[in-house]
Structure formats: structure tokens, C-alpha cells
Amino acid sequence: MSTTTIASNAVNGNHYEQLHQGRTKMYKSKVDVVLGAQWGDEGKGKVVDMLASEVDIVCRCQGGNNAGHTVVANGTEFDFHLLPSGVVNEKCISVIGNGVVIHLPSLFDEVLKNEAKGLIHLENRLIISDRAHLVFDFHQHVDGMQEAEKGGKSLGTTKKGIGPAYSSKATRNGIRVGELLGEFNLFSEKFKSIVNTHLRLFPSIKVDIDAELVRYKDYAEKIRPYVKDTICFLHTALRNGKTILVEGANAAMLDIDFGTYPYVTSSNCSIGGVLTGLGLPPQTIGEVIGVVKAYTTRVGDGPFPTEQLNEIGDLLQTRGFEVGVTTKRKRRCGWLDIPLLQYTSLVNGYTCICITKLDILDTLAEIKVGVSYRRSNGDKLDHFPGTISELGGIEVEYAILPGWQTSTEHVRNFKELPENAQSYVRFLESHLSVPVRWVGVGKGRESIINVH
């Protein structure tokens, strides 16, 4: 290699480095992300509510009204399915991103119900992406039919039309919010086309096209004030130093790629879904907060290695009030699963952890934690199984930790927790090699203990 070439490469290297640094400096702030580390229902909404008091913008990036988050603010319990949990903070803007699929009747119903509980001025602080896809009633009918056809092998879908809507998106015949707000005759033609496609595939569903078009013409005007290009909005916010928090819906083990497929949802509930669901580049991501329930729960069917079909499972279900916000189904309950958490941490790159519902374990004399998986032949697994048949055939090895058998409900300082409760937290921390920053011991935001 000549001296000239070496010099040229050095100059180019400096040039590209300068360009990279310049691009990085475009953004004066970062995007922090809250993700569910198990199968959902970890308490992400409460964590978002706590953090939302310190940020300018809170975003939803994927999923639809199949998600359910409960937030207790000033003694009032709010249930959210499409709205970001941070919407209870009147000082921040809430964003529904392009990766979300929206059933407009459910969205407006959710707004009305929560306004009746005291949610105010939403019209000034909710922004909806013009690129978000719409969920129609026929998507929900199809969802129910497809689930019924599976018989004993059902996936436990919420029947909210989420999967069929994402299918329409993937096959490029879905309809986006922006199209509803454009020329209505173009929307009408596209709506008729997608309905007719579904009628050919599912002849038994009934759709009154004319009545639906009348309804959606009304919806168009109702939603119009909320809609804008959220991608430009978020990038402008970052360049201006605005703080942004993203609330992941569902959870890592329900991710379409990384979860226990096919017992998953139809979107990416991991860190990748944040980027594609909001139009953000990787360098904008700051903290990635994994929310971990102190035990494990799951709604619906699918493998669950540490599930306890006994009095322990019943106790966790009863003490934890484990009933789905969206489905109202009882959640299956079991011990904490370290291999599962190590896997979701690997995928998501958690920078810190929030443990929730530690107080539910208060009455137990001893607590088990799943620490490794073995095949039926005794071989230890060094990875999380990629198929449900492999996962269904594993045996869990448990560590047994002493309980604390005293109430933690009113503790507000980590050092005031019982010693065994502190040890339980440190046990998880050491096995994940990720710091635990918060511990939850109750429902409200005031019950979250800052560990450090």
C-alpha cells in the first residue's frame, strides 16, 4: 500500500468520524424505554407513570388494544389499552406511533371512560401517527373465527383483531390513519377492496359497507385534530433536547420473533419494535428498563416452565389479583425464571431492572427461583429453547431462598426491607448482571422504592 493511499485513508477516516460525531450531536437528548421482561402484566404502566412525571413525551410503539395497563394516580385507577400510561401526567405529550394498530371505536371508548375518571385536556396532548394502521371490526371477527378453528390448539388470542390487522399490513392491503384523513372517496374504494378480500376468505362474516363508511367518515373528523407525522415530531423533539419515554406493550416473551412462537402476539415487543414503531435510529436509545414481576405469570395458552399448578400458584394468583386487564382471564402463576430473564436481557440489552409486586411474596416461608434448564436426559441447556416442543420437554432446576414472612407494603426505603427480601433482589441482580434500580411493593407510584 502506497504512502498516498495510507494518507488518503487517514483523511477519509477522520472525515467519516467527524460526520458520525456531527450526526450524533444532532440529538440533545435520549429516548428511555420501558419493556416487559416476561409474558406481560409485569407492571410496566406503573413504572411509566412514575417516570412520566419527569419527561416531556411518552410513546406507544407497537401492539393495539390487546395490551392492558393499569395506573393508580391520586387514588384513581385508570385502565389503558391504546393510550400510553403517561397520559395521566398533564404536563407531557402522549404519542401513538406508526407501529401501533388502532381500532378507532375502542380508542374513543377508552378516551370517554378515562375522561369520566378525571382525565382532562387530552385533545391538547395526544398525537397519533398518520402511518399507524387501522383495525376494523371485520379484523376482530376474523380473529375470533381463526381462534375457534384451532379448537384445542388455540393460541389464547384476545380476539381484538390485532393479528389480522398486522396481516393486512404485511400483505400491503391495510389502511393507515393518514388515508382515512385524505380524499374520502379513495379511502372508500380501499375499504371496499379490503372488505371484499376478507369476504372471499371468510364468507360467513357480515359487513355493511355503506354503514361502515358513514361511521368512518365521522371517525375521520373526530381523530383529525390528533394526527400528525410523529416521526418528524419525535426527531425535532430530540434535537431540541426534549426527554422521551417509550412504553412497550405486551412483553419480550410475546414478541413475534423472540417469544414462545406461535403463542405470541403479532408485533415486535422487544427493543427492535421501538425503533421501527417510532422511526428512531439506534443511537437515540438511552436507558432500557426491563420490568420484572417478582414471580412469573402468563395469560392464555403456551409453555410456562416454572408454572405452579398447586397451592403456590393459587396463592400467587389470589394475593396478586392476577386477572388480565384486557381479557379478564385468570393469569397462570409460577416462580421467577432466571433463564427466561437472561434470554430477554440478551435480546433487549437492559441497562437496569425494576422488580414489581415483591410484596406478593410476603407470606411465603421459602421461595423458589428457576435457575437453569435441563433436557430430560440430564444435559444442561446453554440457551433458551427456540421451539415450544423443546421448551415443553425441559426440566427446571430451582434454588430455594428463605422468605421474610412480614409485610413490605409500607416500606419506602430499600434498606428497610427485610434482609431476606433484599437478598432476593440481589440474587436476581447477580444472575442477570444488570442493576436493579427500583422495587415495587404495592399498587401506586408511591410504592416504588428507589434502590440506589
UniProtKB/Swiss-Prot annotation:
Pathway: Purine metabolism; AMP biosynthesis via de novo pathway; AMP from IMP: step 1/2. One of its GO terms (cellular component) is cytoplasm. Substrate binds at V325, T326, T327, K328, R329, K330, R331. IMP binds at D41, E42, G43, K44, N66, A67, G68, H69, T158, R172, N250, T265, R329. Disulfide bonds: none annotated. Its main location: cytoplasm. It comes from the Eukaryota. CDD domains: AdSS. Its EC number is 6.3.4.4. Plays an important role in the de novo pathway and in the salvage pathway of purine nucleotide biosynthesis. Catalyzes the first committed step in the biosynthesis of AMP from IMP. This is Adenylosuccinate synthetase. It comes from Drosophila grimshawi (Hawaiian fruit fly).
